[in-house]
């Protein structure tokens, strides 16, 4: 099927208008989830304070992880539309049960005679008895926090993305083998991207001699981050790359690959830089050593900050409608959110490119072969 440029623009416009409209529906249906520590407050909230709580909860719903996959919530009936996820915790023994036992954070879950409550920021705490409450001050519970290995919303999307990538690229590999290195179907879309990563990222930064050993990781990390960023643009409250734990894991993996594949020249330039006076070597060595750990940290923060900032900007623009409650502001907010959403598509691909490019730079510096005699002659 062939689309004209005009038809394609219409499809894209409808696609993002639908996303924005669904986001409006999520905002109007989202209820503030009060923590147990605030349950003792009896003061009556004003309409402005209630709206602020709803807006804050709407933002939190889209940027934080959760133990259930919630799509919509009916404010009048209190009905949640979504599905629970498995809870896996360690508290002197392994406990496995459904997140539905928490009843969206309003109930105590029982497992093998122990009782647990879902607290602030989706952390699970042990409580005393079926009616146990969280205790503490300033929203910091003093209850015992258990080790949480649950399949949360972010973990589920990691699995979905991994399966999607396996399905796409295993099919691409089969089409290559079957048709004599000629991609077919959806592989025609991904083949130029694979070649771009190889020819414009891997080879220029790592070199033709060593790039092949890193291609698997570079391709995986590029498409992995890109797909996760695209999922984050949907109104489903998925924000995997805006989770500092996820980006930290990606940064640590890059750090380990760089460290364990580096050659002696790499370590020589760190601990005893050639061509530099000895007093300067003593000063530069700890700085270079610190740089080893700063690089993956920069990778982690760059991706995390850019993605979560984009989500918060979009959510804040949507919230303007319910703050000003005017038709003009509604139209303005909708159009501005539409434009920002389109920019976010570019940012999703750009952040995947930057992460892959920086990883390739680190790998290239780790395997670079230096010729000191020529360089410092």
Could you describe each region identified by the protein language model?
Residues 167-205, 265:
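Hydrophobic transmembrane alpha-helix segments characteristic of membrane transport
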Residues 141-146, 197-210:
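Cytosolic juxtamembrane amphipathic/interface segments immediately preceding
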């Amino acid at each position: 099927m062939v689309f004209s440029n005009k038809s394609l623009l219409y499809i894209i416009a409808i696609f993002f208008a639908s996303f924005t409209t669904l986001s409006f529906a999520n905002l109007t249906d989202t209820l503030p989830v009060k923590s147990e520590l605030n349950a003792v407050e009896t003061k009556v909230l004003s309409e402005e304070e209630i709206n602020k709580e709803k807006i804050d909860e709407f933002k939190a719903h889209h940027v934080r992880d959760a133990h259930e996959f919630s799509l919509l919530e009916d404010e009048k009936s209190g009905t949640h539309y979504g599905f629970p996820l498995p809870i896996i915790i360690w508290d002197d023994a392994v406990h496995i049960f459904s997140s539905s036992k928490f009843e969206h954070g309003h109930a105590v879950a029982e497992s093998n005679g122990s009782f647990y409550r879902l607290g602030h920021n989706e952390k699970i705490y042990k409580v005393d008895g079926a009616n146990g409450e969280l205790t503490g001050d300033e929203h910091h519970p003093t209850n015992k926090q258990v080790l949480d290995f649950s399949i949360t919303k972010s973990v589920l999307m990691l699995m979905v993305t991994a399966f999607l990538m396996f399905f796409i690229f295993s099919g691409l590999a089969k089409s290559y083998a079957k048709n004599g290195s000629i991609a077919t179907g959806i592989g025609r879309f991904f083949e130029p991207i694979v070649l771009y990563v190889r020819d414009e990222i891997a080879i220029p930064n790592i070199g033709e001699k060593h790039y092949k050993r890193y291609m698997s990781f570079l391709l995986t990390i590029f498409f992995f981050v890109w797909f996760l960023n695209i999922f984050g643009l949907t109104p489903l409250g998925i924000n995997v790359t805006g989770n500092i734990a996820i980006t930290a894991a990606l940064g640590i993996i890059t750090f380990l690959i760089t460290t364990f594949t580096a050659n002696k020249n790499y370590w020589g330039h760190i601990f005893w830089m050639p061509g530099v006076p000895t007093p300067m070597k003593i000063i530069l060595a700890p700085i270079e050593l610190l740089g080893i750990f700063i690089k993956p940290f920069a990778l982690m923060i760059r991706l995390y900050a850019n993605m979560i900032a984009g989500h918060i900007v979009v959510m804040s623009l949507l919230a303007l409608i319910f703050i000003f409650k005017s038709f003009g502001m509604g139209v303005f907010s909708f159009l501005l959110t539409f434009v920002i959403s389109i920019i976010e598509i570019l940012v999703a691909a750009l952040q995947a490119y930057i992460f892959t490019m920086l990883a390739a730079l680190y790998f290239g510096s780790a395997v670079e072969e230096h010729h000191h005699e020529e360089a410092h002659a």
